[in-house]
Amino acid sequence: MTASVETVTVKVLLFASYADWIGRDSVEVSLPAPATVSDLVRQLREEFPQADRLPTRPLSAINAVHATVDSPLREGDEVALLPPLAGG
């Protein structure tokens, strides 16, 4: 008998340089559950060679609510990863 591994699939929205590095403005990623934003960043780095440039603690939001790297991910979440913003 084989054990099934629960997964969580999320939609990742990428902006500015992050989208340029990965070559798309959104991707779907499946992760072993339980998963956090930190796990998501690690998975992106494994799946996309240029994503190794992503910071370990990117500005992020889950379903349009500010999140941290320790925030848990749930099935169907929409996770936005935003590069640092500058203004004047």
What are these regions (language model features)?
Residues 1-87:
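Ubiquitin-like/PB1-type beta-grasp interaction modules and other compact soluble beta-rich domains
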